[in-house]
Amino acid sequence: MPNFPRTDLAVEAEAIHRSAAAVTELPGVRAEETNRRGFSVTEVHVLDAAGENALCKPTSDYYTLALDPLLRREDDAFENAAQTLAELLRRVLPLMPDASVLVVGLGNRAITPDAVGPDAIDSVMVTRHLREQLPEHFGQFRPVAALAAGVLGTTGVESADMIRALAVHLHPDAIIAVDALACAELDRLGRTVQLTDTGITPGSGVGNDRAGLSRDTLGIPVAAIGLPTVIDAGGFSDDPRAEQMFVTPRDIDTVVRDAAKLIGYGINLALHDGLTIGDVDMFLS
């Protein structure tokens, strides 16, 4: 069996497997690129069992948002990126107007490349308690709770167990999980955001798989949003020791901070109709 590069991105997996098979299209897989507000969005649709076998990913739709205009600091790039991310999130997680949502940040805040999830939670508008206590002022907002779940090594509790217990108590209608991913191409490292409704397995990007979060394990829809922050060093070296190493950009602190804010704002715009970036700024200030 070929030794394919490690990646969590469906767009990379599609290209890698298609190239290895020397075909223009994989069976059961459809890929297309669109442009939204000046941002490139690649859609990979795994259609059936043939697609699952070809791509080694569950049947679903995978959206990859390229952040190039934002990284170039183009005018209105942050707002356009956040609005585009919100549109994609609404596609993977359609919700009734008053459906409640639990947003979960996965990862270890103390390790910068793994801090995307916890840092994104800092930019999420938490409204569940406000709706309950001040319905006259916050009744128009969707009930949203948030959790930075931590990691097993610092909490002694599996993230999935913690989230499952909280879900039993809160009864959310859906969960949004944010996590760091691994990619295979330098052009995508810290430069793309992937969204899907298949859920997520914490730690899978670096070969440290934990219990998964999905509709199958939690009983409700689980949307996953991920930013690739590491790349397998084995792709750059023939030294077998490199297979146990991952590399990350030297400006990863800035990359994670900016992307986490974008993801948080995109979640807010997706969950609360009619909000603007200015509204979110004011709420979080």
Language model region names:
Residues 108-142, 146:
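Glycine-rich phosphate/diphosphate-binding loop of Rossmann-like nucleotide-binding domains
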Residues 167, 172-173:
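Proline-aspartate-enriched helix->loop->beta-strand connector
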Residues 55-83:
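Helix-enriched interaction subdomains in cytosolic or periplasmic regions
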Residues 106-114, 153, 180-184:
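Gly/Ser/Thr-rich loops at beta-strand to alpha-helix junctions
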Residues 66-68, 100-111, 146-150:
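Short glycine-rich or small-residue beta-strand-to-loop segments that form or flank ligand, phosphate
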Residues 147-148, 161, 177-285:
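A structural signal for small-residue-enriched, beta-sheet-centric alpha/beta enzyme cores
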Residues 139-167:
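A structural-propensity feature for long, helix-poor, extended segments
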Residues 1-59:
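N-terminal amphipathic/basic leader segments beginning at the initiator methionine
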